[in-house]
Amino acid sequence: MTNIRKTHPLLKIINSSFVDLPAPSSLSSWWNFGSLLGVCLGVQILTGLFLAMHYTSDTATAFNSVTHICRDVNYGWLLRYLHANGASMFFICLYLHVGRGLYYGSYTYSETWNVGILLLFAVMATAFMGYVLPWGQMSFWGATVITNLLSAIPYIGTELVQWIWGGFSVDKATLTRFFAFHFLLPFIVAALVMVHLLFLHETGSNNPTGIPSDPDMIPFHPYYTIKDILGFLIMLTALSTLVLFSPDLLGDPDNYIPANPLNTPPHIKPEWYFLFAYAILRSIPNKLGGVLALVMSILILAIVPILHMSKQRSMMFRPLSQCLFWLLVAILFTLTWIGGQPVEHPYIIIGQTASILYFLIILIFMPAISLMENYLLKW
């Protein structure tokens, strides 16, 4: 008798995706982040659903409704901080997942990679709109500053901003629509995840060596299910520790002050996971130029497959490219730090230098070093 998991119309889809899926035998822990992101998305949707039951998207009551959740709802404080810090954990896993893809050449699966970039944009949009909902000072001013960037678009900019705001400033209409989209987008993200996995399972996984592993496959279950569960435990332990011991570590104290359009905070900044892009935006004195640089800082990932000049897929055997990769990581940390600093000397020049290096490494140095490595290996 054939096993039901191989014959049942629904179970066989799950079986071919998570049980009998052929996987390379050499996958390291860097391949855990896909499943960790799935867990993060699940946690965010669940906690968000329960928070939405108590939240009111009205400028007069939004801030108080969040206070009510924390003080009066059973374990409301836990839901709120799991959701807020869950977003941070989501982005940590997301950036590590993208970094893994860059290091090991996973971007050569162009469909999977491009859907991944769409996912990154969708998650960033979701997180931005979520940050506006508590209606604290940083929520209000962050929404004002970031949405106002669209006014840099020629001809239609001003009308576009007012259309998004639903008026002449960030107000009740803006908060209501942001809440609606913040609720909707995670489900669109979940649908995109299915497409991402569909394309991935068409080609099969890459592996650390970058060498085709067709002759050496093992079933996903039990080998990688156990490995993934260990990853879940480590990540959930880290998230629980953050939530229970230091829930406000990654937040901004200004967001505990109710939104006041008449009082601008001394330093407007987004959440920590957007600071690198915010630093690139600020490093260009021209508004339109800054907005283009901001978009390109993420969109540049789409042209990485075109810039791949090496005869080898992975960086595992390319020490010069490895040095450049880790320099890029250091620059991203520098940009994150600069994004959180005030706009004054010496931070301005450090931000501009780091921004230029960020684009130079990806666009020029990486392809040039790859060609040099090809030559050194006489290929």
Swiss-Prot record:
GO terms for biological process: mitochondrial electron transport, ubiquinol to cytochrome c. This is Cytochrome b. CDD domains: cytochrome_b_C, Cytochrome_b_N. The keyword Ribonucleoprotein does not apply. It comes from Phyllops falcatus. The cytochrome bc1 complex contains 11 subunits: 3 respiratory subunits (MT-CYB, CYC1 and UQCRFS1), 2 core proteins (UQCRC1 and UQCRC2) and 6 low-molecular weight proteins (UQCRH/QCR6, UQCRB/QCR7, UQCRQ/QCR8, UQCR10/QCR9, UQCR11/QCR10 and a cleavage product of UQCRFS1). This cytochrome bc1 complex then forms a dimer. Component of the ubiquinol-cytochrome c reductase complex (complex III or cytochrome b-c1 complex) that is part of the mitochondrial respiratory chain. The b-c1 complex mediates electron transfer from ubiquinol to cytochrome c. Contributes to the generation of a proton gradient across the mitochondrial membrane that is then used for ATP synthesis. A ubiquinone binds at residue 201. Its cofactor is heme b. Heme b b566 binds at residues 97, 196. The lineage of its organism: Eukaryota, Metazoa, Chordata, Craniata, Vertebrata. Binds 2 heme b groups non-covalently. One of its GO terms (molecular function) is metal ion binding. Heme 1 (or BL or b562) is low-potential and absorbs at about 562 nm, and heme 2 (or BH or b566) is high-potential and absorbs at about 566 nm. Heme b b562 binds at residues 83, 182. InterPro entries: Cyt_b/b6_C (IPR005798), Cyt_b/b6_C_sf (IPR036150), Cyt_b/b6_N (IPR005797), Cytb/b6-like_sf (IPR027387), Cytochrome_b (IPR030689), Cytochrome_b_C_euk/bac (IPR048260), Cytochrome_b_N_euk/bac (IPR048259), Di-haem_cyt_TM (IPR016174). Belongs to the cytochrome b family. One of its GO terms (cellular component) is respiratory chain complex III. The chain crosses the membrane at residues 33-53, 77-98, 113-133, 178-198, 226-246, 288-308, 320-340, 347-367. It is found in: Mitochondrion inner membrane. It is a multi-pass membrane protein. The keyword Iron applies. Its main location: mitochondrion.
